[in-house]
Amino acid sequence: MEQDLIIRIIELLGTFAFAISGIRHAAAKRFDWFGGYVCGVAVAIGGGTIRDVMLGTIPFWMTTPIYLICTGVALFTVAFFGKWMEPLKNAWFVFDTLGLALFTIAGIQKSLAFGQPFWVAIIMGCLTGSAGGVIRDVLLNNEPVIFHKEIYAMACVLGGFVYWGLVTLGISAELCAIVSFVITCVIRFLAVKYHISLPVLKENDNSKNI
């Protein structure tokens, strides 16, 4: 399978998963349909747009309307099937995690396709996977998940290093993507299940007197 096609498929799947997550958060805030769609679009294309601008290329969603259509499908999915998905305790979290892993891989692969070194590709993968969530939280007036709670962006970084290691061993791009996807998801699932997070910065008592 051609590299461009792989990236396109991953971006499409990631768009749907992230759009579902963003629209669900908007629904929890009692947004109307338009507000939910805007939130879904922001999550779905935010990270990839920043990545493409930094790579000096046209943002992926501007080359075809399929991504905006996909977000529309996600909106109708939440609007009409959300009540059946609500009893599934972790359904919304799963969509967010799938989007995170898929967009991380898409960011890495696209950066490598543009000839970037691997350390840049990992940063771009992390940006693609997590920036949309930051935009979502800002729109919803929430503290961005990436800055607190369980491991989020670090799951992207670790998944990126796994991808790099497999590529170094000469593994095919398809298998690298699958393994990296699984690892990123597993790290995120375990982090939430066992409340694993990075150390929290604490303000020095002396600084309060300054």
Model-derived segments and spans:
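Small-residue-rich segments of transmembrane alpha-helices in multi-pass membrane proteins
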Residues: 40-48, 96-109, 127-128, 151-164, ...
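Cytoplasmic-side transmembrane-helix entry/capping segments in multi-pass membrane proteins
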Residues: 34-40, 64-69, 89-100, 122-124, ...
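Ordered, amphipathic secondary-structure segments that act as subunit-interaction surfaces
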Residues: 73-111
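C-terminal ends of transmembrane helices
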Residues: 19-29, 49-52, 76-89, 134-144, ...
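Intrinsically disordered, low-complexity non-transmembrane regions of multi-pass membrane transporters
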Residues: 1, 196-210
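Short, structured motif recognition centered on aromatic/hydrophobic residues
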Residues: 38-42, 49-55, 123, 127, ...
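Helix-coil boundary and interhelical linker segments in multi-pass alpha-helical membrane proteins
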Residues: 1-6, 52-62, 106-120, 165-176
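Structural signature of hydrophobic alpha-helical transmembrane segments
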Residues: 3-15, 59-73, 117-129
